[in-house]
Amino acid sequence: MRVRYKPWAEDYLKDHPELVDMDGQHAGEMTEWFDKTQPIHIEIGSGMGQFITTLAAQNPHINYISMEREKSIVYKVLDKVKEMGLTNLKIICNDAIELNEYFKNGEVSRIYLNFSDPWPKNRHAKRRLTYHTFLALYQQILNDEGDLHFKTDNRGLFAYSLESMSQFGMYFTKINLNLHQEDDGSNILTEYEKKFSDKGSRIYRMEAKFHSQK
């Protein structure tokens, strides 16, 4: 997705340090950042925030972190958080490779990866969010019962991710090869998901854990 640069976005985000971490000021203090101590769920690559703000509104007993590196998108998440009055959702404007700088070992209960960039060229495989380098970070910050939820419309990325997770030592608790055909009504659509499902694109989904967590 091509993002149009918003020169004012950075200053806007910096005006709300209580909601947005721009430079690691809350690194290692994620639990303390919230008003209440509750389980923490993360969405990496939140886009415009429809998915995670909906989750936060539906589940006030869970604390949510939206992690998105594009400042020119993050402001839309911030707008939603303010408009909805969400006190259980914070935003990190940074790259996922910095996860272990922000979260303590075992601090996170769930990670969501929704419609991540597939990076289709083999030479870019290391950038995929299901590459083993990222899986190692997820394993580090997830607690013993923690899991990973993954959705994509890209069949190649889904197949790659299944293989990558299996090789890393993960097991799958749920796999959907056509989510919207099998959906029980609990699925929350992202902006991207709605756009492509309306065109008839198949959506793939999985839930996974690390074997060491059994």
Curated annotation (Swiss-Prot):
Task of the protein: Catalyzes the formation of N(7)-methylguanine at position 46 (m7G46) in tRNA.
Enzymatic class: transferase
UniProt KW keywords: Methyltransferase, S-adenosyl-L-methionine, Transferase, tRNA processing
Family per similarity comment: Belongs to the class I-like SAM-binding methyltransferase superfamily. TrmB family.
Enzyme nomenclature, EC number: 2.1.1.33
Binding residues annotated for substrate, in chain numbering: K121, D153, T190, E191, Y192, E193
Domain of life: Bacteria
InterPro entries the record matches: SAM-dependent_MTases_sf, tRNA_(Gua-N-7)_MeTrfase_Trmb, tRNA_methyltr_TrmB_bact
Listed pathway(s): tRNA modification; N(7)-methylguanine-tRNA biosynthesis
Protein name in UniProt: tRNA (guanine-N(7)-)-methyltransferase
Pfam family, one: Methyltransf_4
TM region positions: none
HAMAP family the UniProt entry points to: tRNA_methyltr_TrmB
Active-site residues, Swiss-Prot/TrEMBL: D117
Residues the entry annotates as binding S-adenosyl-L-methionine: E43, E68, D95, D117
A molecular function GO annotation: tRNA (guanine(46)-N7)-methyltransferase activity
Catalytic reaction equation(s): guanosine(46) in tRNA + S-adenosyl-L-methionine = N(7)-methylguanosine(46) in tRNA + S-adenosyl-L-homocysteine
Gene Ontology terms: cellular component: tRNA methyltransferase complex
Gene3D superfamilies: Vaccinia Virus protein VP39
